[in-house]
């Protein structure tokens, strides 16, 4: 058996994108929750290219006396998971907790995650109770969770909730991965020996709007499908085989019917032939599109461009910053 190392310091990583209304309350509540831990702690706020005053508020919070807040400013918007990975590269804690900035997942749940991780778990996930989202968001989340569970074989109930805890070795291992499209909860579970979930409260969004539009959810679905498995390519091969066999069988049937009923019948079957042709063409375009998704993602991985560019890092009790690029 492997004994988990004791948790001496907790790092809370929070990606921020146009959350100026919620930031003061977020910082206050997260700070209060961390102070109750009885451990060393830090909060890392990552500005993901916000166009409002989020970055200024973050910098101000880092520069306050006795601040525990590290502000990381990206030069533009790279997406939630890339921003979290940028935060991971600057943490110093033994346990790292991710949290959304919209306050739908209460920061007051942080001590419960730390206590559960103290039992020896590598990853502690959460399941949102009484979700305060729209019916569309709930339905999309159920489909995504079902897809992930079927693909990975990991019976985790709520991959969409970013309130999660990871031990430092899991974080270090994820940082060594270089996929361009990264879905952190799934990647962490691949490396975790012991993972569990706990139920948490879920609140209605008080400030601003959700940053996940319909098209971003569709893109997330594509990311999950193409990053997790090659099963769609195998299904595509199976579909192609079925269509080929069906087309050959139909051709034989048409020849037999022509011989049996004469050429007049064949002329009357033109529309059926067009229908079959369009079916084949449609299947080919579906296959080409799916194949293109895989090839495009392989191309992005081969180019090995950085996931993000860190423009500034503001540490507590210091107004200095560094400029650097990270993978």
Curated annotation (Swiss-Prot):
Pfam families recorded: Glycos_transf_2 (PF00535)
Any one Gene Ontology cellular component term annotated for this protein: plasma membrane
Native source organism of the sequence: Salmonella paratyphi B (strain ATCC BAA-1250 / SPB7)
Membrane-related topology note: Multi-pass membrane protein
Domain of life: Bacteria
Annotated CDD domains: DPM1_like_bac
Gene coding for it: arnC
TM spans (from-to): 236-256, 270-290
Lineage of producing organism: Bacteria, Pseudomonadati, Pseudomonadota, Gammaproteobacteria, Enterobacterales
Name of the protein this chain belongs to: Undecaprenyl-phosphate 4-deoxy-4-formamido-L-arabinose transferase
Pathway annotation from the record: Glycolipid biosynthesis; 4-amino-4-deoxy-alpha-L-arabinose undecaprenyl phosphate biosynthesis; 4-amino-4-deoxy-alpha-L-arabinose undecaprenyl phosphate from UDP-4-deoxy-4-formamido-beta-L-arabinose and undecaprenyl phosphate: step 1/2; Bacterial outer membrane biogenesis; lipopolysaccharide biosynthesis
């Amino acid at each position: 058996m492997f004994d988990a190392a004791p948790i001496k310091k907790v790092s809370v990583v929070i990606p921020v994108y146009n959350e100026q209304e919620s930031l003061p309350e977020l910082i206050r509540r997260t700070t209060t929750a961390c102070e109750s831990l009885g451990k060393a702690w830090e909060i890392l706020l990552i500005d993901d290219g916000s166009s409002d005053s989020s970055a200024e508020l973050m910098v101000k919070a880092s520069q306050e006396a006795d601040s525990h807040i590290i502000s990381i400013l990206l030069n533009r918007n790279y997406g939630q998971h890339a921003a979290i990975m940028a935060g991971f590269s600057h943490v110093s804690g033994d346990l790292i907790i991710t949290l959304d900035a919209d306050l739908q997942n209460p920061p007051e749940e942080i001590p419960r995650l730390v206590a559960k991780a103290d039992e020896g778990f590598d990853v502690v996930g959460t399941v949102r109770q009484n979700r305060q989202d729209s019916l569309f968001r709930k339905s999309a989340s159920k489909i995504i969770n079902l897809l992930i569970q079927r693909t990975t074989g990991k019976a985790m109930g709520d991959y969409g909730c970013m309130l999660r805890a990871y031990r430092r070795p899991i974080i270090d291992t994820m940082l060594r991965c270089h996929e361009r499209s990264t879905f952190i909860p799934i990647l962490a579970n691949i490396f975790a020996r012991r993972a569990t979930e706990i139920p948490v409260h879920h609140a209605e969004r008080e400030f601003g709007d959700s940053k996940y539009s319909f098209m971003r959810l569709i893109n997330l679905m594509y990311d999950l499908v193409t990053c997790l498995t090659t099963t769609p390519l195998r299904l595509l091969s199976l579909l192609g085989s079925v269509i080929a066999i069906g087309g050959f069988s139909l051709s034989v049937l048409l020849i037999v019917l022509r011989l049996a009923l004469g050429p007049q019948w064949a002329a009357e079957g033109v529309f059926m032939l067009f229908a079959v042709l369009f079916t084949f063409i449609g299947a080919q375009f579906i296959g080409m599109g799916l194949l293109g998704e895989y090839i495009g993602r392989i191309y992005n991985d081969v180019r090995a461009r950085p996931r993000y560019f860190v423009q500034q890092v503001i540490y507590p009790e210091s107004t200095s910053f560094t400029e650097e690029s990270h993978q």
